[in-house]
Structure formats: structure tokens, C-alpha cells
Swiss-Prot record:
<dbReference type="InterPro" id="IPR026015">
    <property type="entry name" value="ATP_synth_OSCP/delta_N_sf"/>
</dbReference>
<protein>
    <recommendedName>
        <fullName>ATP synthase subunit delta</fullName>
    </recommendedName>
</protein>
<keyword id="KW-0375">Hydrogen ion transport</keyword>
<comment type="function">
    <text>This protein is part of the stalk that links CF(0) to CF(1). It either transmits conformational changes from CF(0) to CF(1) or is implicated in proton conduction.</text>
</comment>
<dbReference type="InterPro" id="IPR000711">
    <property type="entry name" value="ATPase_OSCP/dsu"/>
</dbReference>
<dbReference type="InterPro" id="IPR020781">
    <property type="entry name" value="ATPase_OSCP/d_CS"/>
</dbReference>
<dbReference type="GO" id="GO:0046933">
    <property type="term" value="F:proton-transporting ATP synthase activity, rotational mechanism"/>
</dbReference>
<dbReference type="Pfam" id="PF00213">
    <property type="entry name" value="OSCP"/>
</dbReference>
<comment type="similarity">
    <text>Belongs to the ATPase delta chain family.</text>
</comment>
<dbReference type="GO" id="GO:0045259">
    <property type="term" value="C:proton-transporting ATP synthase complex"/>
</dbReference>
<keyword id="KW-0997">Cell inner membrane</keyword>
<keyword id="KW-0066">ATP synthesis</keyword>
<keyword id="KW-0139">CF(1)</keyword>
<keyword id="KW-0472">Membrane</keyword>
<comment type="function">
    <text>F(1)F(0) ATP synthase produces ATP from ADP in the presence of a proton or sodium gradient. F-type ATPases consist of two structural domains, F(1) containing the extramembraneous catalytic core and F(0) containing the membrane proton channel, linked together by a central stalk and a peripheral stalk. During catalysis, ATP synthesis in the catalytic domain of F(1) is coupled via a rotary mechanism of the central stalk subunits to proton translocation.</text>
</comment>
<dbReference type="GO" id="GO:0005886">
    <property type="term" value="C:plasma membrane"/>
</dbReference>
<keyword id="KW-0406">Ion transport</keyword>
Length: 180
């Protein structure tokens, strides 16, 4: 576990607990996504790293860039001030990622990586999503990528469950059994 994860975890947990209490999980996802994107821009990274920029300037810049909804949200403004004062703004992408893990656990959503030989049609994606939801007893969020080296089929990873339905995987198993 990296130091940044260890440092980001309490922030993410506190934000999650606040969002849960306020019943605003999706809104806070949007806020954190926007903040994480902003701090990763080269200009913002340079400005934040510049010792000549004050905490007040950094806070003002972030609130200005992020728009009017930030000006009306005291909790969000307090978060920005806290992260700025503690020199933790660059942890926002990590905080956002940890927040999303907490949110997925709360909403019983499991992110499933699907690597397919070819593009899946919307109907195939729907069937796959329904089948996995039923098998795993959770809602699933599919993250689909294409890999022609599979030769056909798909490779599915959901947490520590791996389903290798690829032609390449079957050929590897056949080769292993023939070699034994």
C-alpha cells in the first residue's frame, strides 16, 4: 500500500460518511471527479507546486474553476480549504478513487473488467451484465476493453473471480494438459 493511499483514506472515508448522511453520494462523486481532473491539469499542478502561490490563491482558483455549485456548498469549500492547508490537493485523484470504492460497497456495485476479442453489442453487454449480477448477487458495472490477442471469446475479472472464456485461454489449458 502506498503512502498516498494511507494518507488519502481518512479523507475519502470522511467524505463518504458525510455524503452518505446527506444522501448525496452521486453528487459527491461528481464533485470529486471534477476536482481530481482539475488538479491533474498541467497548469493546476504547476500552480499548486509553486511555493509562491498562497493557500488562499489555490482555494480561490479551485472554487472559481469548479463553478457556482461549489460556492454554495460549505462542506465542499471546507474540504478544499482543508486539503489546501494540509498540502494534500494532489491526493484528490486517490481520494476520489477510494471514495468510489466505498460508494460501490455501499451500493453493492461491483466493477467487472471484461476483455473481449471483439466489440460487444449492447444486447450482449446487457445479457452479460444480467448474468453476472445474478451470479454475484450484486449490481455490476462493466468496464469493457478489446484485445484481439484473445483469438476469440472473453476474459472476465470481478474482484478475485476470473472467468477465462477466451480461445487463447482454452488453447493454453489444452497445451498444459497435453504436456502433462
Amino acid at each position: 500500500m502506498s503512502d498516498s493511499t494511507t494518507i488519502a483514506r481518512p479523507y475519502a472515508k470522511a467524505i463518504f460518511e458525510h455524503a452518505l448522511a446527506e444522501k448525496k453520494l452521486s453528487e459527491w462523486s461528481e464533485y470529486l471527479t471534477l476536482l481530481a481532473q482539475v488538479v491533474l491539469t498541467p497548469q493546476a499542478t504547476q500552480f499548486i507546486a509553486n511555493p509562491a502561490s498562497t493557500d488562499e490563491q489555490q482555494i480561490e482558483l479551485l472554487i472559481e474553476i469548479c463553478g457556482s455549485k461549489f460556492k454554495k456548498n460549505d462542506a465542499l469549500n471546507n474540504l478544499i480549504k482543508l486539503l489546501t492547508t494540509n498540502k494534500r490537493l494532489m491526493l484528490l485523484p486517490e481520494i476520489k478513487a477510494l471514495y468510489e470504492v466505498y460508494r460501490a460497497e455501499q451500493e453493492k456495485i461491483l466493477e467487472v473488467d471484461v476483455v473481449s476479442y471483439s466489440e460487444l453489442t449492447p444486447a450482449q453487454q446487457q445479457r452479460l451484465s444480467e448474468s453476472l449480477s445474478q451470479r454475484l448477487s450484486r449490481k455490476v458495472s462493466l468496464k469493457i476493453s478489446i484485445d484481439p490477442s484473445l483469438l476469440g471469446g472473453a476474459l472476465i475479472r470481478a474482484g478475485d473471480l476470473v472467468i477465462d472464456g477466451s480461445v487463447r485461454g482454452k488453447l493454453n489449458m489444452l497445451g498444459t494438459s497435453l504436456a502433462a
